[in-house]
Swiss-Prot record:
Keyword tags: ATP-binding, DNA-binding, Helicase, Hydrolase, Iron, Iron-sulfur, Isomerase, Metal-binding, Nucleotide-binding
Lineage, top ranks: Bacteria, Pseudomonadati, Pseudomonadota, Gammaproteobacteria, Pasteurellales
EC assignment: 5.6.2.3
Alphabetical GO biological process terms: DNA repair
Entry cofactors: [4Fe-4S] cluster
Domain Helicase ATP-binding: start-end pairs: 16-278
Residues that, per the record, bind [4Fe-4S] cluster: 114, 174, 179, 185
Gene that this sequence comes from: yoaA
Domain of life: Bacteria
Annotated residues for binding of ATP: 51-58
Entry protein name: ATP-dependent DNA helicase YoaA
Source organism of this protein record: Haemophilus influenzae (strain ATCC 51907 / DSM 11121 / KW20 / Rd)
Pfam families per UniProt: DEAD_2, Helicase_C_2
Cofactor, free-text remark: Binds 1 [4Fe-4S] cluster.
Similarity annotation: Belongs to the helicase family. DinG subfamily.
Residues covered by the Helicase C-terminal domain: 458-634
């Protein structure tokens, strides 16, 4: 039987999926996507496919991948989707199709408990207060029962717990086969399973870490793959940029100092100079950290900052101390395997520092971020099209890129150009939802000018009656932290509804609370614009404060704008609009998640109707009914 008939049978009314998966119903769009994926796998070709919400794209790419049975990598944008795929979707479809191959889940090492670090922390004590000590005892208890060491499974631990960085290894600090705990290592075990599996679920960060630096032990995965499927593919260009660049972080430097001190105190007690030099470096790193932000999150241009004499002086002192540390370690080389591996890290940091001082190299953005507690110095390529495009050419495999948000104004040009994708089959599959019936899009009249000082209160005044008429059940998605905090404060002052604010607890807990407290309002920013799935009555109103253009002074964007201009392009139309369109599509996509959902999206930005480019945004959004009258919005919400 050819693959098309096989796929048609799987997705038919009486097929394997209908018979084995509760609630499965055949969808024309899903079948069309499954055919396209199957064809790409058979021909070892590239496919770029946008599948609107409700298409059922996960099964549409999983079924053909399992049918062909080739070595497959599936890469997701978020760890949430990665876990959902591995723990929910894959077991269901594997059982339905009676697939007997091996499947594996692989994350980056920062997700796994490091037993060597755990031993060190138990021996030396944790960094932090009593609450961190309590977290440690939770981890020790969990370690007795876990088979994977994946922190996601430790449900008693918050995802942003301060204990996690103390208990995970980094590529630099990992001792590899020299580690006394290597035989029980969770990272090594996960990688071994991945290498032996027929289908591996990874995330984009891990995929590009491997592609860019060939981190030892994982380098064999991509070369063996015959099918590579990227879900949430709209995130790829930005993630790829991070990995084809260079970064030096305060964590790398603090970890280095800590590890040197451990060697001095345990293995080389006679090397007092080692401890002294490490302590001096630690002090220099702490001082340098304070120059890059003092509490608030700061991102800026490293080239510009490096011209300031105080920063340059502090940076040169950092280089000097690293050079001296290298000389001190040389005196003890061969006496400790741990110190030998630390020496390699120091040499690598020396190279990174040298590159960060060579700020005149073109084609890269030099930028920094800091908040008083930690910092990062980065060199990011302005384009990854040549590097990624070369990988596509060199590797004979099926490359499949899918997301609900890839096209802008009816084409994939922006996405394909950023990744150097050529000669790919391109397809747009529209959502099967009845948007004109299920949803209403409103750009209200009489909106305050976005530049006015009183915007916040005026906006709150306009929106609160609608939110209260809907009894909450609302996401307010903001484009800045100041607007997010300001609106939350306004609603808390003026309304009796439960107002939840991003950052006050973890993302998972906020969503849980939002669904449980039926009359609540969640005010959030970037991380809630995508990857959040709330179905049914719990969410029937999504408010977006303005079009999500990235601030033009954001260092990476600024560098790309300058580069585009130098090449004779139009940065606003070529870069800023396409990226804002994709972000807006993600935000709007939070509303209608199922055939029975109904609700309203309010976008508080006149530019959608007053500027020519507004049409590009509107064309890319679902074809909801439209109004500018908030009374009609209230009517629609009350007639649900």
């Amino acid at each position: 039987m050819d693959y098309e008939n096989q796929i048609a049978n799987i997705f038919s009314l009486n097929g394997e999926l209908s018979q084995n998966i509760k609630g499965f119903r055949p969808r024309a769009e899903q079948l069309e996507m499954a055919y396209a994926v199957g064809k790409a796998i058979q021909n070892k070709s590239s496919l770029v496919i946008e599948a609107g919400t409700g298409t059922g794209k996960t099964f549409a790419y999983l079924a053909p991948a399992l049918v062909f049975g080739k070595k497959t990598i599936i890469s997701t944008g978020s760890k949430n989707l990665q876990d959902q795929l591995f723990n929910r979707d894959l077991p269901a479809i594997k059982k339905a199709l009676n697939f007997t191959g091996k499947i594996a889940l692989l994350k980056g090492r920062a997700n796994y408990l490091c037993l060597e670090r755990l031993d060190q922390v138990i021996a030396q004590g944790v960094l932090g207060d009593k609450s961190v000590l309590a977290e440690l005892s939770k981890v020790r208890k969990w370690n007795n029962s876990t088979k994977t060491g994946d922190f996601t499974e430790c449900i008693e631990l918050a995802e942003d717990s301060p204990i996690i960085p103390q208990l995970t290894s980094t590529a630099e600090s990992c001792l590899g086969t020299d580690c006394p705990n290597y035989s029980e290592c969770y990272v090594a075990s996960a990688r071994k399973k991945a290498l032996n599996a027929d289908l591996v679920v990874v995330n984009h960060h891990l995929f590009f870490a491997d592609m860019a630096v060939k981190e030892s032990g994982f380098g064999e995965l991509i070369p063996n793959a015959e099918v590579i499927i990227f879900d949430e593919a709209h995130q790829l260009p930005d993630i790829a940029s991070q990995y084809f660049g260079q970064s030096l972080t305060s964590r790398q430097l603090f970890d280095l100092c800590k590890d040197i001190n451990i060697v001095y105190r345990t293995e080389l007690k006679d090397m007092q100079q080692l401890g002294t030099t490490s302590d001096t470096l630690l002090k220099v790193v702490q001082d340098f950290r304070l120059l890059l932000g003092n509490g608030s999150n700061v991102r800026g241009n490293w080239r510009e900052l490096y011209t300031q004499s105080a920063v340059k002086k502090a940076f040169e002192l950092l280089q000097e101390k690293i050079d001296f540390l290298s000389e001190v370690i040389k005196l003890a080389l061969g006496r400790s395997q741990t110190l030998d591996s630390i020496f390699e890290r120091v040499e690598s940091i020396k190279i990174q520092l040298k590159r960060l001082s060579e700020t005149n190299i073109v084609g890269y953005c030099y930028w920094y971020e800091g908040n008083g507690r930690q910092f990062g110095l980065h060199i990011t390529p302005l384009t990854v099209a040549d590097k990624f495009g070369a990988q596509l050419e060199a590797k004979e495999a099926a490359w499949i890129f899918t997301s609900a948000t890839l096209e802008v104004g009816g084409t994939f040009n922006h996405f394909c150009q950023r990744l150097g994708i050529e000669n790919a089959t391109q397809k747009i599959l529209y959502s099967p939802f009845n948007y004109p019936e299920q949803s209403l899009l409103c750009v209200p009249r009489y909106l305050p000018n976005t530049n006015q000082m009183n915007t916040l209160n005026s906006l709150g005044e306009i929106l609160l009656p609608v939110i209260e008429a809907n009894k909450g059940r609302c996401f307010v998605l903001c484009t800045s932290y100041s607007m997010m905090r300001g609106l939350a404060e306004y609603f808390r002052e003026k309304s009796h509804l439960s107002i939840l604010l991003q950052g006050e607890t973890s993302k998972g807990k906020l969503l849980e609370q939002f669904i449980k407290e039926t009359h609540s309002v969640l005010v959030a920013t970037s991380s809630f614009w995508e990857g959040v799935d709330v179905r049914g009555d719990a969410l029937s109103l999504v408010i977006i404060d303005k079009l999500p253009f990235t601030a033009p002074d954001e260092p990476l964007l600024k560098a790309r704008i300058e580069d585009c201009r130098l090449q004779g392009g139009d940065p606003f139309n070529d870069i800023q609009i396409p990226e804002a369109v994709i972000t807006l599509k993600q935000g709007v996509g939070r509303l209608i998640r199922d055939v029975t959902d109904r609700g309203v999206v309010i976008i508080c930005d006149n530019r959608l109707v007053m500027r020519n480019y507004g049409e590009t945004f509107l064309k890319s959004l679902p074809n909801s009914s439209r109004t500018r009258d908030l009374n009609k919005v209230i009517q629609f919400l009350q007639n649900k």
